[in-house]
């Protein structure tokens, strides 16, 4: 079983989009060559959580779709992806994931265990859901 772990992409609203596209294309090629079974992005896809540009939405949408076309992709919110000080505000990624409606794209916003298959479970400790942090099950140690 092969997992690809990605984190801290920090896509900027108006800068470096050409460079992001080049890096992402190389990533897609590498993930395809490696034939990964699951992709997990552990947060901070956005660099600025409260002021999202159309360019960010387009680049992020393409990124998510391309990853999910390669393997089931799980996105965990990072502190840059939502507003920790105002929980009534929506995070930057939910509308994008919802609009894509991709069968292999999952946004994990809450803490807890997520079963990938009969063998593997990931334990999410969300910065947006600290009160529900759990330790892995005894059988998983």
Q: What role is predicted for each listed range?
A:
Residues 38, 51-61, 65-141:
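His/Asp/Glu-rich metal-coordinating catalytic cores
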Residues 1-63, 69, 141:
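N-terminal active-site segment of His-dependent metallophosphoesterases
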